[in-house]
A protein has these predicted regions:
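Conserved N-terminal phosphate-binding loop of PLP-dependent enzymes in the Aspartate aminotransferase
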Residues: 1-420
Length: 420
């Protein structure tokens, strides 16, 4: 595979950006490569500057559930651009998108539009603290909630990929109020509440973890979190930046039947544009300025172009939910079976999955980190050399889109099954 142009561009990028990238995992260091530079994408395919074609299972880290360059989404964005790129003012699209979200996720009675998952989570936690008048928060080892200071403690995603358990540059005081629990471990949560339950503002969790690889919740775990937070007057926040509108039209909360107090959304809700959401119970969200004293604002919040992409995407998902989600499940199950046929240890929930290179059943951060990252690098490079574009990290998810064709799935399965 010729990557001459990508290598030249990467050499230039190193002079301008740390590691030559704008997000650490993209540097591909954990898989022993330099990154590909992408020229264009359409449907299920992505094309690099050297003309190589790949079947894309990164899907921009989750947003592209409909595939790249979906015609209705492109049309909506193009039309919105004709009216101006940003207003810094109210517009009707904000209401239309909010209605679509609330209709499909009834736990979100009131919401705010922001620009990234990090911003959504940061704001949701501030709201939880303001509402409860408490400072401490509980997060889980291996769960990643963006790069705000108080949450960069044993995080997943790029932190785990690059073996950085806690980020430098974060004063100790920022994380003193962050309490760590083990994912899928009720006892570890119970101990925290036994010790200081009346000081805990919220528990934030990925209802299906997807940033230490895909790790589904054990039966009853989310229900336990709902019950213990209610008992102690704490709020339950579901970080559905990845799972929202992907595991079902109503997200993980509908799939698992557990209703959080607050939810954060990103990726799919913006249709491929920078847009995220935080929202929840009306009485909680009324704490946000100008109604309340919890402050949050943003120059580009509710950007009309991003909102148009979100509306178009959610309308397609809503209109075609009875065909899209079963189709995603069927295609994803085929790939999962191919992984199992190759002897791989796979976790899958809906259209997200991870093949873990470990003999242990992966249920939390400790078991995820037993994975052989060198073996994963071999697997990644085998896929790439055969035209399959997967995450350059053992600890990221593989995403299936509605645009993946039968031929795509068949080829992918053949390449995976050849890796033994």
């Amino acid at each position: 595979m010729n990557t001459t142009q990508s290598e030249k561009l990467y050499a230039q990028a190193l002079d301008f950006m740390p590691g030559g990238v704008n997000s650490p995992v993209r540097a591909c260091r954990s898989v022993g490569r330099t990154p590909l530079f992408i020229d264009r994408a359409e449907g299920s395919k992505i094309y690099d500057v050297d003309g190589n074609e790949f079947i894309d299972y990164i899907c921009s880290w989750g947003p592209n559930i409909l595939g790249h360059k979906q015609p209705d989404v492109i049309k909506a964005v193009t039309s919105a651009c004709q009216n101006g790129l940003t207003f810094g003012a109210c517009h009707s699209g904000e209401i239309e998108l909010a209605e679509l979200i609330r209709k499909n996720m009834p736990s979100i009675e009131m919401l705010r539009l922001v620009n990234s998952g990090t911003e959504a989570v940061m704001s949701a936690i501030r709201v939880a603290r303001g509402f409860t008048k408490r400072d401490k928060i509980v997060k889980f080892e291996g769960c990643y909630h963006g790069h705000s200071d108080g949450l960069l403690v044993k995080g997943g995603s790029g932190l785990l990929t690059n073996s950085i358990p806690n980020s430098a540059g974060v004063p100790k005081g920022y994380t003193d109020t962050t309490l760590l629990a083990k994912y899928n471990d009720e006892e570890s949560v119970q101990q925290l509440f036994d010790n200081c339950g009346d000081e805990i503002a919220c528990v934030i969790v990925e209802p299906c973890a997807a940033n230490m690889g895909v790790v589904p919740p054990k039966k009853g775990f989310l229900k336990f979190l709902r019950e213990i937070t209610e008992k102690h007057g704490s709020l339950l926040i579901f970080d559905e930046v990845i799972t929202g509108f992907r595991l079902s039209l109503g997200g993980a909360q509908k799939l698992y039947g557990v209703k959080p107090d607050l939810t954060t959304l990103g990726k799919i809700v913006g249709g491929g544009m920078p847009l995220a959401v935080y929202g929840g119970r009306k009485e909680i969200m009324e704490c946000v300025a100008p109604l309340g004293s919890v402050y949050q604002a943003g120059t580009l919040s509710g950007n009309p172009v991003a909102v148009s992409a979100g509306i178009a995407t959610l309308k397609i998902l809503e209109k075609n939910k009875d065909s899209i989600y079963p189709e995603l499940e069927r295609k994803s199950a085929k790939i999962e079976n191919a992984m199992k046929n190759a002897g791989l240890n796979v976790n899958r929930v809906g259209s997200i999955m991870t093949a873990f290179f470990t003999d242990k059943k992966v249920v939390d951060y400790d078991t995820a980190t037993t994975a052989d990252t060198k073996r994963y690098a071999e697997y990644y490079n085998r896929l790439l050399e055969n035209g399959i574009y997967a995450a350059p990290s053992q600890f990221e998810a593989m995403f299936v889109s509605f645009a993946h064709t039968e031929d795509d799935i068949e080829k992918t399965c053949q390449v995976i099954e050849s890796f033994k």
